[in-house]
Amino acid sequence: MNKPSLSIVIPTYNERENISKIVARLKKTLKGINHEIIFVDDNSPDGTSDEIKLFIENNSRINLIHRIGRRGLSGAVIEGIYAAKADLVGVMDCDLQHDESKLLDMLDLFSKSPSLDLVIGSRFTADGEISDKAFSKVREIGSKIITVIIKKILSINSTDPLSGFFMVRKESFLKCSDNLQTQGFKILADFLSMSGKNIKIKEVGYKFKNRIMGESKMSFLTILELFSLVISQILKGRVSIRFILFCIVGLSGIFVQLLVTGLVLIL
């Protein structure tokens, strides 16, 4: 296959049921566009990699990076972008919550602006939205609050710095890739923070859809990793997310132990 004009990187973990659906949707959306799809799977126990391999047998556009002993969405995205053959790389989740049709709008913006570095799919622009059942109301409000905090602390100029849906010029990404954290889930916020004001950004609003199959990867650990990223960025990357998480867990353990000891002494 000739050099593609677009690479799509899709990190996966336990998304076997969604592979056929996202492949079909991308095939329909990107018809007539020379593209490749790079799945980066963190050794999913549900057989996601095996499902992807079935499609590889009959489709030269599909590639798989099967990671063993390495975990984390950020690291998966970084590896996928490094492996991409195209100059433009789209990043999206496999859970079908991102609107693949917006990839065409992103491509159009790049074609009109050769100096453009990044296009972000945003849930929070005037024409962006979150489906009623995609988030609980509490999570939606929490997401908006965290977004405001992240933008303020890290001085990020984007309506949705926590988006997992974006398209980037590979050359622009590689300029700061050595300084990006492989731990965690919010690679875009890390990239925006490390790039500062040196990149040209545009946004495309989209509707964040409901997850149909599989389970959300959002957890308390995800939130801890996000705040660890913020602390790491404040410290200019001198301390890794992994070490900050270790400290947070360690301190919480000490706090619990002191609390229990205090209660025992009181009672």
Task: Give, region by region, the residue ranges found by the protein language model.
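A conserved acidic beta->alpha catalytic loop
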Residues: D41-D50, L96
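N-proximal low-complexity "stem/linker" segments adjacent to membrane-targeting elements
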Residues: M1-K28
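Acidic helix N-cap motif at the loop->helix transition within catalytic regions
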Residues: E17-K21, D46-L54
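Acceptor/aglycone-binding surface of glycosyltransferases and processive sugar-polymer synthases
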Residues: I65-A83, L88, E100-F185, R211-L221
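Short beta-strand/loop segment that forms part of the nucleotide-sugar
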Residues: N34-S44, I65-H66
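Active-site acidic short loop of glycosyltransferases
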Residues: K3-P4, N59, A84-D87
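Hydrophobic helical membrane-anchoring modules
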Residues: M1-S5, V148, S155-I156, N179-I266
